[in-house]
Amino acid sequence: MYKLNKKVIVAMSGGVDSSVTAWILKKKGYHVEGLFMKNWEEHNSDSDMHCSSKKDLSDAQGVCNQLNIFLHKVNFSFEYWENVFQKFLFEYKMGRTPNPDVLCNKEIKFKIFFEYSIQDLQAHYIATGHYVQKRIFKNKYFLLRGLDATKDQSYFLYTINQKVLKQCLFPIGHLTKCEVRKIARRINLIVAKKKDSTGICFISPQNIKKFLNHYLPHKSGNIITTLGQKIGQHYGLIHYTIGQRRGLGIGGIKGFNNIPWYVVSKDITNNSLIVSQGMNNFYLMSIGLIANELHWINDINIQNSFFCTAKIRYRHIDIPCKIVMHKKKQIKVLFERPESSVAPGQSVVFYLSDLCLGGGIIKKRLPVLK
């Protein structure tokens, strides 16, 4: 083993990815310490709704004991509440569909955690178990997709900047999930068989409806077709997103065929949910979108148009597109072909092959013209 004499703080979540990350770095000779972030205060009144951090902390501590590394424990709940959760609620209240994982990476993991590790703990680097890769060329740092296409997380990291990227390590980005689990089993990590976490980072996925009801005022309203026909009742617009099919409760309506219904828009003023039949119906299709809150990882001149690919949500195949300036701090993204279910509030992330260029927030979609 060779000694790099560099201190790195690993974001330990109690999962297999961060645990293997810590082991790889220690094996390479770094001075490794772990840090467990508590980003959410669990309250007795609603503790059944939340993903408890106690088990994750116990697992993180157990792994650090196995690897003989120190584990810092830090509470970032206030910062999370102010910089992530409040915006999350506001976006839902406005009828949009936010992505809290993008916000969490931007405001917590690659800002608060980064600053605490580099400044307070005097680390040279931070490391996470994200499935992404980093490259350097001519003193510029580039973010690439993870090797495992099914686990690539570059979509969630598009807001990272050069200063932070320079001091980030992503040791499992060149591995597949199967390879990571194989390593965990081989070295007998206590979390080798632990399931991957899913859902919003502060709430279990099965309780999202109850959770939103707890924090946001809402009321039921009409479900209306694009022709203005009332066909049902919704239970609060906050519970629906563009392109949603399941959970509408409007199947088998007399006078309509059996083609599934989809949410095509929300009428906030009249508290109405607008629906139409068929996944590729005219009202759900878009020729492009307008994006704001833009961030480019590397310098990009958007005074001139350029071609790339875009992801309009995490589990989505890249769309060939053209990017042009729209207004100040806004761009127009024109798809090569019409796309379904473009949801305002979601992130749109741009790529050149495996290189993540950056992204922005979908402000509005551009409907297919008649």
Curated annotation (Swiss-Prot):
Enzymatic reactions: S-sulfanyl-L-cysteinyl-[protein] + uridine(34) in tRNA + AH2 + ATP = 2-thiouridine(34) in tRNA + L-cysteinyl-[protein] + A + AMP + diphosphate + H(+)
Catalytic residues, chain numbering: C104, C201
CDD domains per record: MnmA_TRMU-like
| This protein's name | tRNA-specific 2-thiouridylase MnmA
Q: Where does the record place a coiled coil?
A: none
Give compartment(s): Cytoplasm
Enzyme Commission number(s) from the entry: 2.8.1.13
Pfam families in the cross-refs: tRNA_Me_trans, tRNA_Me_trans_C, tRNA_Me_trans_M
Top-rank taxon of the source lineage equals Bacteria
Single GO cellular component term: cytoplasm
What NCBIfam families does the record point to? PRK00143.1, trmU
The free-text function statement in the UniProt record for this protein reads: Catalyzes the 2-thiolation of uridine at the wobble position (U34) of tRNA(Lys), tRNA(Glu) and tRNA(Gln), leading to the formation of s(2)U34, the first step of tRNA-mnm(5)s(2)U34 synthesis. Sulfur is provided by IscS, via a sulfur-relay system. Binds ATP and its substrate tRNAs.
Q: Which GO terms describe its biological process?
A: tRNA wobble position uridine thiolation
